[in-house]
Every structure is written in C-alpha cells, then in structure tokens.
Amino acid sequence: MLRWLIGGGREPQGLAEKSPLQTIGEEQTQNPYTELLVLKAHHDIVRFLVQLDDYRFASAGDDGIVVVWNAQTGEKLLELNGHTQKITAIITFPSLESCEEKNQLILTASADRTVIVWDGDTTRQVQRISCFQSTVKCLTVLQRLDVWLSGGNDLCVWNRKLDLLCKTSHLSDTGISALVEIPKNCVVAAVGKELIIFRLVAPTEGSLEWDILEVKRLLDHQDNILSLINVNDLSFVTGSHVGELIIWDALDWTMQAYERNFWDPSPQLDTQQEIKLCQKSNDISIHHFTCDEENVFAAVGRGLYVYSLQMKRVIACQKTAHDSNVLHVARLPNRQLISCSEDGSVRIWELREKQQLAAEPVPTGFFNMWGFGRVSKQASQPVKKQQENATSCSLELIGDLIGHSSSVEMFLYFEDHGLVTCSADHLIILWKNGERESGLRSLRLFQKLEENGDLYLAV
C-alpha cells in the first residue's frame, strides 16, 4: 500500500530474507493512513521532530536548520538558521501558566558547541550560548523549577533569562547521552555505562545560590546506556547496547528489575537460527522505550517487546518486527503501536489478547522480574503458575507505510492531523487519514458553495 506513490518499496537488508518478518497485503483495511504529503526543506538527515502545539511541529537535523511546519496543511511556516553544524538536541520551553505573555521558546543544541534559544512564533534568536567546552548532546526542562539543563561533558543549569545558575565539574569525555527528571528535585544522567543521580538545590533564605550535587552513581549496566525514560512518578527504565533492561525505583534509586535475555528457542525460529540472529550485540541493543500506565514498549534490535508492569513479564513480542534496527516506538490510542526502522519503513501494530493453552505456558525467559537478588524456587512457584494461566497478547501488523527511501529516524503523532515521519532521505512525510481528509474536503466544498450562493442555485 502506498508504494506506487513514491516509486517502489524497500530492499531487504542483512538476514531479512531468512527472518520471519510479518507482512501485510496491499488491502490494509485497518490502516487509516492512505494519503500523504511529502515535505521538503532540509538538505541532510532529518533526525528530530518536536511538537509545538496542537497544529505545529518543528524538524531539525544534520544541516543545522530548524523548520516549523503546519501539521494540518504541511505548510512551511518558519525556517530558523543559526547553527553551523548538525543539531544534536531540540526541546521546547513553554511559558509558565501564571505568565500572561504566552511565548514558547525552542532550544537547540549543535555540534558547533552552541545552544540557541529561539522565539517559537518568529525567526528571532533570543540568545546564543557559546560557552560550552564540548557538544551538548541532551537538553531537558524542569517545568516546576522553571529551569532547563544542558548535558555534554558536564551538566549545566540555566534559568529562563539564560543565566547560568550552576554546573558540575567535568564528568566524562563520553558526555551525557540522556537526561530525565525524577522526584525530590533530582535528575538522572546517562554517562556511558553509568547512571549519575544529581540533586538541584534551589535558593533559600540561608543561601541565595543554586547548586547541583552528585548524590549517587549506579554502576549496574555492563555497556553504554542507549535509552532512558520515566515510567511513572515512582520508577524509570534504562536500556543498554548489549540488551540490558533495568527498571529503577525513582525515590531510593535501587534496582527493581533486571533482564538481558531477549530470545528463547521457541516457535518463531529454530534454535540455531535464533542464536545466529542474536550473535551481534546490535541485534539486542535497546534503542528506544515508550510506556503508558500499564506497559513498557521496548525497541530491541529489530524487534518489539511489550512488558506488563502489573504482571511483571513480557505479554507480547515481535522478535523480527522490521528488516533492520527499530529506532523509535510510540503508543497510539486503541491499543495500537507504531514503530520505525533503519529499513525505511513505518509499521502499525495492534496489541491483541489471546488465551494461552494449558499446555503452552507463557514464555518466562524475557524480562524475568526480581527484586533484590534472586527469589527462591519455592517462592517463585505461585508466580510461575500465575504466568502459565494468564492471558497473553500478540502484536499483529495492521499497517505498513512505505514512503521513505532511507532510515526513518523518528515520528510524531497528532490526533487530529495524522502521523509525521522524518528520515535520512532528507524528507518529512505527513501521513493523513484518507477517510477523514475526504470528509474535510467535502465539508470545505459545501461551505464554499454556501458562501457563494451556488449551493442553493444547484438545489
């Protein structure tokens, strides 16, 4: 479906022809995205998309340009030029709710060792910050404290007026790769294979200065941490290059769960073929997470895994969801999931329940959950019985969007305006719900006829 609009599909890569890649026919009855708009403005890889409001988004990438788009029409609204090298991070800094002047700031970091703060409604540069000793790889906003943080070889804290409030000493030549806020005025930073917990100390009557203190280092990962997100207010999750998934307590920073076993010799492949597919560490690298109140969705190598927070186990997986590594995953309404890959495809999945047969226990080799140390065999018996009798799920392919000719880096979902994807082919594609768009066109036509008086004349 949609292959003819662009001119051909993707070529299988690597071991794709040997892998059990799920396919779908041309008649994708459950796929609403039957129309597309191709947006051209960039001259290099487009790596980032960020939503500005209900109808606007910004794109950025290796050409150093930021472009603001209308998600409904695909119209190019603004082009922000200022960086001389590729953009490495982009975030928005919304106005405070108490502030009367509602201007949204866009912050961009670049390999040119600068951060530029932009007015989100104009092309105006509010300020350029060029005091960094290394490339800033991540940015995050602490809305409650009305500050933002930049992470490179050190960690800096800034206010809305762009004053440097405090900073850490040099942390690592590797630099901070990811950064999230956790409770108690703390943030957790991924630095190589380490997690570092920092606490922000705001000014008080006794001290007028801000400070940032290192309070703990978590050394449980065996390889570089590639992904880090909050699960909820009480926990966060990390994933590494060699397929380690760890769930952490966000309050006391202890390990709640650890797993690095992402294959078993079960139905999809025979043992030798499965082992062959998993020989390269890249096949089990955890590239991205997303979550909701019930599940964590993990992009692991070429596969997708759904881990139930309540049942403490994987409830569904597609070990070969794409021909190449899955780079981004997000949850949609109606138990749907979207993934994109280095193979140039975007795929839509539906999480469906299926009752396990009594003789077919739910696999427990994925994400086995334990607290502090191993549980005893006796203590694990009730858990095992519960898993064997529990309802498991499957990920069923319901849509395959073929439009990009190279790696799809990430995407955004707009409830009213469709799906936006960006790619190494320099393009952005706006995927539209065909039925909805047809209805809107008909409505606009009737409104125009009514305004001109032609509707009554025709009747």
Swiss-Prot record:
InterPro entries reported in the protein's UniProt record: G-protein_beta_WD-40_rep, WD40/YVTN_repeat-like_dom_sf, WD40_repeat_CS, WD40_repeat_dom_sf, WD40_rpt, WDR41
WD repeats: 40-79, 82-128, 131-168, 220-258, 321-359, 403-441
Superkingdom of the source species: Eukaryota
Any GO BP annotation: negative regulation of immune response
GO cellular component terms listed in the entry, alphabetical order: cytoplasm; guanyl-nucleotide exchange factor complex; lysosomal membrane
Compartments where found: Cytoplasm
Nucleotidyltransferase recorded as keyword: no
Keyword line: Autophagy, Cytoplasm, Repeat, WD repeat
PROSITE patterns: WD_REPEATS_1, WD_REPEATS_2, WD_REPEATS_REGION
Molecular functions (GO terms): GTPase activator activity
Biological role stated in the UniProt entry: Non-catalytic component of the C9orf72-SMCR8 complex, a complex that has guanine nucleotide exchange factor (GEF) activity and regulates autophagy. The C9orf72-SMCR8 complex promotes the exchange of GDP to GTP, converting inactive GDP-bound RAB8A and RAB39B into their active GTP-bound form, thereby promoting autophagosome maturation. As part of the C9orf72-SMCR8 complex, stimulates RAB8A and RAB11A GTPase activity in vitro, however WDR42 is shown not be an essential complex component for this function.
Record text on subunit structure and interactions: Component of the C9orf72-SMCR8 complex, at least composed of C9orf72, SMCR8 and WDR41. The complex is formed of two protomers, each individually consisting of one molecule each of C9orf72, SMCR8 and WDR41. The protomers homodimerize via an interaction between C9orf72 (via C-terminus) and SMCR8 (via N-terminus). Within each protomer SMCR8 (via DENN domain) acts as a bridging protein between WDR41 (via C-terminus and N-terminus) and C9orf72 (via C-terminus). The C9orf72-SMCR8 complex associates with the ULK1/ATG1 kinase complex.
Stated name of the protein: WD repeat-containing protein 41
Organism: Homo sapiens
The organism's taxonomic lineage, starting at the top: Eukaryota, Metazoa, Chordata, Craniata, Vertebrata
Gene: WDR41
